[in-house]
Amino acid sequence: MNYKHGFVDLVGSTPLVRLERIEKEFHLKCRLFAKYERNNPTGSIKDRIAKEILLNALERKEINQDTVIVEPTSGNTGIGLCAVAASLGLKAVIFMPSSMSVERRKMMTAFGAEIVLTDAKAGMPGAIAAAKEFASKTPNSYIPGQFDNLDNSLAHYKTTGPEIYRDLDGNVDVFLAGFGTGGTITGISRYLKEQKKDILTIGIEPEESPVISKGVKGPHKIQGIGAGFKPAVLDLTYVDKVVTVPSEKAYEFARLLARKEGLFCGISSGANVYEAVEIAKTMEDKNIVTVLPDNGERYLSVEGLF
């Protein structure tokens, strides 16, 4: 018999897709590959870190079956945590600004999570403060803390990186990904460089908010990257180069992925593929790899995207 033991067994082992039509569109002399992360159970790469963080916390006895998982989040990590918590029989309480989309709230409540809406004007800092206050007053509560928890990057070191290396038989020349929590770029790059030191690793941030490369914070439209600060999880030791991508190009390439490759992905996927194309224009006969972190369905209400 061949079957999976619930949610956690479904996470990872996503396909690596060659973007051949985009290669032809731009007359590239390199091969572009992308890790198709929408194939994770809730449709994003964040399922990997949600699984790693909660399973490790259970193993270390930092949490138990009566623990309340508390996380301030507005995006994919929250959805992943709610799903993993449900599969493990844990209660989740998610704090998010009231400005966040109704779709995301409904996804989390579908997994049995409790949603606490905070003042939209206070943004994520307000949600973080409210979550910490709640946790301080709630016995046996646990904040996963995706920006600070090293199990975040460990998930990618243990799974995503090895999957990429295996699927290309070790023939990886360039890897690039956006800076969100820093877990994806840190974990994957660390693994790849341990196998092959001369792999070029590139981190991507919004042109309008180049915090890592220039120390400048600003508003941008690339959801999922550009947190506005340097996360503790991000280890630049494993990043050779930092580049910026304009929000408009991220939008354009998210549309291009759908219309040329039939891959319906989110905004950060567009940013990653735009930069992969730009790098490919400067090289020949190289394997360039990036990630497509989530699906486009979560961004249907974003004006001007699709």
Regions found by a protein language model. Give the residues of each.
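PLP-dependent amino-acid enzyme catalytic core
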Residues: 1-306
